[in-house]
């Protein structure tokens, strides 16, 4: 438990990364236990609301043909190949959203289109960061995702990176530190009543970290109220203390930031986090702005993990 002035934020101590902790906020999704040891048939039957008669029909076809349950259901027109793929993903604890259950932003390609080229690009980014920042056997720094200008795709990259890290099974926290134009709560369809700004000003409720529905290992700390003094809040010692505390409680901490054009916030946040990755939009971001941002980190106590050129 970490204290900031007169306010206290409750952070549940992490369990082993393969077993995510219970939800941290009311109304959050349940644990992944519901899918442990469930058969493909059970998952497909629930997904497609199959009646007992339909299930028996599939089982009979399965016995007659020697097909697997999923294959038999597809052959009878009671399920699709995507349904079978989703059921397999559930068995292997690989969370993603099938088409009819997609309730979050279309920007979340790692969740909505996990087998697409765009999702694969985020897995490639994850692999690089696992080697450069999130190395085994150490307390990982928080990773700030920064960009020169609005529209570079910073929130898009931070959100999808957080999803892909959570899909590894480790407890992952996405912090929205963009106290200028916050968007993370919109991307994940979460409440934004209390959050980071309240913690740093000493007036937040205890339960400010929310679990993302359908992704047991992913949690979000939204901005909360947009403050009039965002740069001053992140420059206070409490912000650095909070980042260190969160980094010790979660396997991965990703921090979304304001665009550099708004002020020094993003450079300060990167220094407090300890690591950063820069996002630039291909054929859109200005080279001079990118150079200035990278130069602003020179001499700061931050590891620059690389530059991501966003093509989407």
Q: What kind of region is each of these model predictions?
A:
Residues 69-71:
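Compact, charge-rich alpha-helical regulatory domains located at protein termini
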């Amino acid at each position: 438990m970490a204290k900031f002035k007169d306010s206290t934020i409750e952070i549940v101590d992490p369990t082993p990364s393969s077993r995510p902790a219970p939800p941290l906020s009311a109304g959050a999704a349940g644990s992944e236990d519901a899918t442990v040891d469930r058969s493909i048939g059970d998952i497909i039957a629930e997904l497609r609301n199959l009646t007992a008669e339909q299930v028996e029909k599939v089982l009979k076809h399965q016995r007659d043909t020697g097909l697997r349950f999923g294959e038999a259901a597809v052959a009878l027109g009671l399920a699709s190949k995507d349904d079978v793929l989703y059921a397999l993903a559930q068995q292997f604890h690989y969370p993603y959203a099938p088409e009819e259950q997609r309730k979050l932003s279309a920007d979340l390609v790692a969740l909505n289109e996990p087998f697409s080229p765009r999702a694969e690009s985020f897995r490639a980014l994850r692999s690089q960061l696992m080697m450069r920042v999130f190395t085994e056997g150490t307390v990982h720094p928080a990773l700030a995702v920064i960009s020169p200008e609005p529209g570079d795709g910073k929130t898009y990259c931070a959100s999808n990176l957080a999803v892909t890290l959570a899909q590894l099974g480790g407890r992952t926290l996405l912090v929205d530190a963009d106290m200028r134009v916050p968007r993370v709560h919109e991307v994940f369809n979460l409440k934004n009543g209390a959050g980071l700004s309240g913690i740093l000003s000493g007036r937040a409720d205890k339960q400010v970290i929310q679990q993302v529905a359908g992704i047991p290992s992913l949690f979000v700390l939204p901005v909360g109220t947009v403050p009039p003094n965002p740069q001053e809040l992140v420059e206070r010692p409490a912000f650095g203390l909070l980042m260190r505390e969160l980094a010790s409680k979660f396997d991965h901490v990703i921090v979304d930031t304001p665009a550099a054009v708004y002020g020094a916030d993003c450079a300060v946040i990167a220094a407090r986090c300890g690591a950063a990755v820069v996002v630039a939009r291909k054929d859109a971001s200005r080279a001079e702005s990118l150079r200035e941002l990278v130069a602003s980190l020179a001499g700061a106590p931050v590891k620059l993990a690389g530059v991501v050129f966003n093509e989407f």
